[in-house]
Amino acid sequence: MSHETGGADTAQDDEHVVLGRLTSPYGVKGWLKVYSYTSPIEGIFEHAEWVLSKRGERRACKLSQGRPHGKGLVASLEGISSRELAEQWAGADILLPKQALPALAPGDYYWYQLEGLRVETLDGECLGQVNYLFETGANDVLVIRPSEASLDERERLLPFLPDDVIRQVDLDAGRMIVDWDPEF
């Protein structure tokens, strides 16, 4: 499963996925610190054509250079050559057209594809919707939030274990079937 996701931001739309965020200027030549939602974090640099989104304004830009810096990342973008310009884009989301994402093998999914799916048990009971996912050492975990159709108001954490817990993912129907006891 690929970890490129939309994070918790609203800049994501039907055509774009949020890969990360520009956090603050770095130095005086227009470099910016980058917080990446990709796994590994350097994966954000595999995409040279970015769309920056901040407060409803969008700007297409090209990645000139990117590199690790300490525990994070820094990037230089074409057209942003001073600290003042970098400050204007600090806090911007880094978007990528979904069509630019690499194709995945059957049974693999990007996290953003799973977010919002209705989650049902093998017996057809609705547990809620996938709100978001997070990574643990052993496996990824789905956070299932209650919805209007869910059988109760409980939030659940389900391990993303294909064939064991996750029995079927139907993106077209917007549904995931899980082998999970609703009482757990």
UniProtKB/Swiss-Prot annotation:
Its main location: cytoplasm. Keywords: Chaperone, Cytoplasm, Ribosome biogenesis, rRNA processing. PANTHER family: RIBOSOME MATURATION FACTOR RIMM. HAMAP family: Ribosome_mat_RimM. GO terms for molecular function: ribosome binding. Belongs to the RimM family. It comes from Chromohalobacter salexigens (strain ATCC BAA-138 / DSM 3043 / CIP 106854 / NCIMB 13768 / 1H11). This is Ribosome maturation factor RimM. GO terms for cellular component: cytoplasm; ribosome. The keyword rRNA processing applies. Pfam families: PRC_RimM, RimM. GO terms for biological process: ribosomal small subunit biogenesis; rRNA processing.
